[in-house]
Structures are given as C-alpha cells and as structure tokens.
Amino acid sequence: MRLSRYFMPTLRETPKEAEIVSHRLMLRAGLVRQEAAGIYAWLPLGLRVLERVCAVIRREQDRSGAVEILMPTVQSAELWRESGRYDAYGKEMLRLKDRHDREMLYGPTAEEMVTEIFRASVRSYKDLPKNLYQISWKFRDEVRPRFGTMRSREFLMKDAYSFDFDQAGARHAYNRMFVAYLRTFAGLGLKAIPMRADTGPIGGDLSHEFIILAKTGESEVFCDKAYLGFDIPPATVDFDDVAALQGIVDAWTSHYAATEEMHEPAAFAEVPEDSRMAARGIEVGHIFYFGTKYSEPMGAKVAGPDGIERPVHMGSYGIGPSRLVAAIIEASHDEAGIIWPDAVAPFDVALINLKVGDSATEAACAQIQSDLEAAGLSVLYDDRDERPGAKFATADLIGLPWQVIVGPKGLAEGKVELKRRAGGERESLATVDLLARIRRV
C-alpha cells in the first residue's frame, strides 16, 4: 500500500482531551477519531490492528472448541426481565422503544440472549457441552467515559457462553477458556496474569480477571513475581484432557495474585519479600462461572439420563478487542510512538523512500515492495514527497515492526538500511538479504 493513497490522518500535536499514552498515540497515529463522548470511528490503520487482534482471539477460541455465532445488538427488554436484570442494571443500559412502543435495549452484554437461543434449540444432555461466542459491538452508557478506547461507551467485545449439564462439566469449560485466554494474550505479545476477581453485575461463584502490567495501568494489583516466568501452554495442549487443563489452571493460580478489590494484605505478606510485586495493571479479559443464575429463571433446561429436566450450568468469558488495542499500546511504546508486537501490527514493514522522483530509488522501492509482498509480508510504502525526518517520525509514530530505508547513497553500494522498531537496531545490508534477515526474527 502506498502511503500517498492511504487514509492515515496523523497529528503532530497531542490532543488536549487525551489523558493517557494509548489515547494520545491512537489519535496522533490516525488509528481512531472521536465522534462523541466515548464513541470512536476506527480509521484504516486502527481497523487493521483491530482485525488482527480479532484473528488471534478467533484462532484460540476455535482451537478450544468454541463455535462462533452473531447475535443482534438490539435486544428485547422481556428477556432481561426474565433474568431479573432489566431493573437492576441501572443507567448504563441504553433503553429504547420501537414504533410499536415495545421496550428494547442496546445490549451491554448477551447472557439473556444466548440463553434464549440455547433453550429454544437444546433439549437433551446428549447435546452438551456447548460453547458459543461472538465478536460484536456493545454499548454501556458510562457516567464518565475516558482514556479513549480503554473505557469507551461503544466497544467491541468477544463474549463466549458455555452450557454444561453439571458443575463438573462447567468447571472444565471454565478451564478451557482459562487456558485459551493465556494463549490468546501470549499470541498478542502480552504476558497476562490471571487474578481472582469480583463477579460484579454478571454474578456467579468463580471469576478471574486477566491483567497485564503497565506503568499507566488503571488500577493497582498485587502478585508473586514468579508469574513473570511461567510458560504459556503450548499449541498442542489437549482441551479435552480434563486433568491436563486442571493442572495448568492449578499452576497458574497457586501463587498470590489479586486485584485491588480482592487484595488480602495478610496473605500477601506471606509471599517472600523479594517475590512480592505491587504494580499498576490493565484488565484485558474476564471469565465467570455462574452456575444456574440465568438458566434457572429463564427455563434453560435439558433432560438428563433419567429423563428429569435440570437447568444447565453456564459460564461467560469476555475479551474486549477495542480495549486490547489500547492496552497493547500502554504496554509497548516509547517517546517516539507505538511499538506494535509482530502479531498485531497493521503492516509488517514501513518502506521509506528517501528521494522521491529519483528513478533508481523508486525502482528499488518498487522491487523491494513486490518481493516482500510476494513473500507474504504487508508493506506500507512511504512514497510522499516529504523530508526524510518527517518520514522517520511518521514511521516511529505508527510503530510498524520493521523499517526499510532506501536512498541513493546506499543503493550506490547495493545496500539499504533496516531498522527494528522495538529495539532501534539498524543495519546496512544488500537488498537480496532483506527478506531472510526479517524472517530470522
């Protein structure tokens, strides 16, 4: 893609309304634009990141055995009255009426909707277990939306819902998602620590938040440093192996880790002093087991082996892709701009032409772009007639993993310059060696 033809409205100055690093950089790099309080338009560069984040989430959800669906955003108020949450949810829920005066709502979550879908379709324990997930836009009318897409009113959410015949099956479903989440965040270039959490308005008996550590995190967390060295479950993990999954969950919950709300100073004091860590953290995922909280009042039942109908046991599992984009930036940036992990970068390579109009330089850039794209790499070619300094600043700001810098002086020696954005290392090499060098990382 040529930058001269792309839509990437960057900003030189930091917008006054941006309070945290990710919000500032998302606006300056042209990822998003605010359209109303807590509501953002995703521009081409930001949308590419969002789609890559969703691709990693889908890969791990599918691998765990979850099945994707898509539910309507506008829901009937009657479903929420069945569960008892319509009046309890509060002003965060956007309520509306259609032309026939029927009460509707813009879904902030979908437990009721998915329970209704399940109860209309599944009748026997033989059809269990089931885990259904979607990636869709939600709306919560926050009193004070802030921090850009970190705490917006409209947000993209991956929400999954498991249905099992009994508590043992539901716990296995919970463990599946626990392990899938560990792999998801690792696949996004993040080290997430699961922490016991409050169940909040969703309710239930068991809940974990997945927290990444960041200096600009929104809340304080407390944990054992041992978590930083834990190995991520491999791609070969067997999600049907109950004992293996339980072993992974036990290992990842055996040390102290708690959010500020669940923190127990006395228990934390038992952690060896040199292993204690109090830091700022950002919630990037939340999983819940809530038993029959929704299935009981909504009549989501299946017949067991004895023919008796029983309410199914449920869990829900959320990851916010739009929030994750901001969280990744909070965890990976420097003074010059964003540093995207390879897995989610909008493009793999920033190709920088130092002398637009020079036939040799333009021919070399065209060939490099063609070769890299033929090898499966995505390239953003800066062919603008701008000063080199401005091009370097733009490349650092948008944070693509690699920068390939092409100019007449280097080409005279048959070489180009390659820069790794994450560490800032630069090296001069022959164009024929470029692809092999990039792939070595």
Swiss-Prot record:
It is found in: Cytoplasm. It comes from Methylobacterium radiotolerans (strain ATCC 27329 / DSM 1819 / JCM 2831 / NBRC 15690 / NCIMB 10815 / 0-1). This is Proline--tRNA ligase. It catalyses: tRNA(Pro) + L-proline + ATP = L-prolyl-tRNA(Pro) + AMP + diphosphate. Gene3D superfamilies: Anticodon-binding domain, Bira Bifunctional Protein, Domain 2. The lineage of its organism: Bacteria, Pseudomonadati, Pseudomonadota, Alphaproteobacteria, Hyphomicrobiales. InterPro entries: aa-tRNA-synt_IIb, aa-tRNA-synth_II, aa-tRNA-synth_II/BPL/LPL, Anticodon-bd, Anticodon-bd_dom_sf, Pro-tRNA-ligase_IIa, Pro-tRNA-synth_IIa_bac-type, Pro-tRNA_synthetase. SUPFAM superfamilies: Class II aaRS ABD-related (SSF52954), Class II aaRS and biotin synthetases (SSF55681). Catalyzes the attachment of proline to tRNA(Pro) in a two-step reaction: proline is first activated by ATP to form Pro-AMP and then transferred to the acceptor end of tRNA(Pro). Keywords: Aminoacyl-tRNA synthetase, ATP-binding, Cytoplasm, Ligase, Nucleotide-binding, Protein biosynthesis. Its EC number is 6.1.1.15. Homodimer. Its main location: cytoplasm. One of its GO terms (biological process) is prolyl-tRNA aminoacylation. PANTHER family: MITOCHONDRIAL RIBOSOME PROTEIN L39/PROLYL-TRNA LIGASE FAMILY MEMBER, PROLINE--TRNA LIGASE. HAMAP family: Pro_tRNA_synth_type2. Belongs to the class-II aminoacyl-tRNA synthetase family. ProS type 2 subfamily. NCBIfam families: PRK12325.1, proS_fam_II. GO terms for molecular function: ATP binding; proline-tRNA ligase activity. GO terms for cellular component: cytosol.
